[in-house]
Amino acid sequence: MNLCIYEDIEAQAFGALALLRPVFALRCGIFTLAEKLALAFPEARVHLLVRPHLEDWTRELFPDADVAEPPEDDTLFVNGRLCMTDDEVLHFMAASPQEVSYVAQGILFAAKVRGSRVRHVVRHLREGDAERAFEDVRLPAEVQAFLARSGEDLIRWSPRQIVQDARYLFQGGIVRGSVEPGAHLIKPEAIHVARGSRVMAGAVLNAEGGPVVIRENATVEPLAYVEGPAAIGESSIVRAGARIRAGTSLGPVCRVGGEVAETVFQGYANKQHDGFLGHSFVGEWVNLGANTNNSDLKNTYTPVRTFASAREFLEKRGRDSGQLLLGLTLGDFTKTGISTSFTTGATVGIGCNLFGTELQPAYVPSFVWGQPGSFQEHRIDPMVATAERAMERRKVALATALDALLRRAHEETKSDRDLYLGAMAVARRDPQP
């Protein structure tokens, strides 16, 4: 069968997290959204429809998929924001002998389409018009499913997704790696230690609250504590003395120390030292300096407000997230200096270099350098040079397609950044009493 995962116009709601990748490449639980669908249909030929400027980079991210090449046979189309549903629902959709569409919470998110109509559907999906794409498909069926609407949903749903993903693919009570004498496994029947991984003496894996999955070639160093549900990604390292609280998911090749709670690391990110990070989403190639901390709960115990643009921030028009616990969203390639602190629900774009002991603002646009009170633009050439050096340390080359995306994103975010930096300059020149 053919499985076509597509982006819709709501991709923009993910802000900096979706500047350098399709929405379905984001992580929620152990896997990315696309990986969940591919695992549900292991025999399917996967086709991907993304924003045109992402096509080249998507081909490198998903080398086994067809990108922007519509299939010719019957196809199951699924919105790439699909995060949670029952596997039986997915297989029911795929097995349908006729055209049918599926709705969850009033949103049409999937449809089985005959081969003769696939190109019609693809044309309208590329135009961002999912409604017209599927308008002739028979009356939709309502099913139980959840579509992510922002990075906040990925943070909030990740703990439950770790449990579901672990049940789907990782058998508990399996130790294929090395668990050294002196390591402590609490409720070992819910712990999976994959081949090539290492749990060192003095480490504690506690699965009383949910499964703990240690993936291939990962290391949990002495005196580290990992509390389930939790997932430690391929070739990642949990540093000695770290406290990995329930609901945390590390993607591949991360280095994590200090205290982390209910946080998603997309992959290839460093938080080597002490400091707290909670209810947050960390993009790729992020490096957090020692004692970087964030708040994830207001002293007033009221819902956290977030900002999606400089204009919203400057006009104090934050959006009520409805969440009491919400931390930090950090875009790809962003760095922090030692003792950097972030307020509750802060949003930081891609390519930033932030430092200083003063509390960072609740919103920082992409490609900003400096500390509160003296922010300036992070110029693209030195930013890319830093990215290349960081990636070389992990034996990864900066792909031409990703380089081009970074430069495009720098231009794409210019108006937002200029508005923000201009207002900050005025505030420095004419401080309010």
Which ranges hold each PLM region?
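Solvent-exposed, charged interface segments at domain starts and junctions
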Residues: 1-24, 28-42, 209-228, 232, ...
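Terminal amphipathic alpha-helical/low-complexity segments used for targeting or macromolecular assembly
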Residues: 1-188, 196, 357-433
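Glycine-rich hexapeptide-repeat left-handed beta-helix
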Residues: 8-13, 25, 240-241, 247-425
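A generic short-segment signal for beta-strand/edge and adjacent turn/coil regions
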Residues: 16-18, 46-47, 150, 189, ...
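A near-ubiquitous, low-amplitude feature marking generic local secondary-structure context
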Residues: 17-20, 131, 137-141, 197, ...
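Conserved beta-strand and immediately adjacent loop positions that scaffold enzyme active sites
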Residues: 74, 202, 351
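Extended beta-solenoid/beta-helix repeat architectures
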Residues: 173-283, 299, 329
